[in-house]
Regions:
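Membrane-embedded alpha-helical bundles that constitute the cytochrome b-like, heme-associated redox core
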Residues: 1-166
Length: 166
């Protein structure tokens, strides 16, 4: 059976050549250590809160401007979170830390998977010819999105704990 530790070591070996390229740039250690949390906090706080607020405005007030903003910001937020996920793995490899072992890794993975599910709800469910079913998809999307934002806050706290421990 493959363990998380063995899989993490295998993944680290795959990422190591990329990390070596970045290490050759002479990036200061504080940037390598705290760059990922700094930029991800901007994405989570600015884009996450805006996506959540605009999403609930659409739900409660049927605001077309908020609908457009929610779609646009949510898509970019998800893109930046996916890029940050890979950047976080790269940062850990650059610092010689193990992969796939921290709760921060697992909550980040869960966030991306849940964002994919939530995006699928809107993509495949909102245009459903059955209006009642489309409404249920919208309700599930709203509450799942709120749960994802809550998970992101918990994820950030785990990240601070991880950052302070290494």
């Amino acid at each position: 059976m493959i363990t998380a530790t063995a899989l993490g070591k295998s993944l680290a070996q795959y990422i190591a050549p990329i990390a070596d390229q970045f290490n050759q740039l002479g990036i200061p250690e504080p940037i390598v250590h705290w760059g990922h949390p700094f930029f991800m906090s901007i994405v989570i706080l600015a884009m996450g809160s805006y996506a959540g607020i605009s999403g609930w405005k659409v739900r409660l007030q049927k605001d077309d401007a908020s609908r457009s903003a929610h779609k646009r910001v949510s898509l970019w937020m998800t893109t930046f979170l996916a890029m940050g996920y890979t950047g976080g793995l790269l940062s850990l490899v650059m610092q010689g830390q193990p992969l796939l072992e921290s709760p921060h890794f697992w909550t980040g993975t869960a966030v991306l998977l849940l964002l994919a599910v939530n995006g699928s709800l809107s993509l495949f469910g909102f245009g459903n010819a059955n209006v009642a079913l489309a409404g249920k998809f919208r309700t599930a999307h709203a509450y799942l999105g709120t749960a994802i934002l809550s998970l992101l806050v918990f994820h950030a706290l785990l990240g601070v704990r991880l950052g302070l421990s290494i």
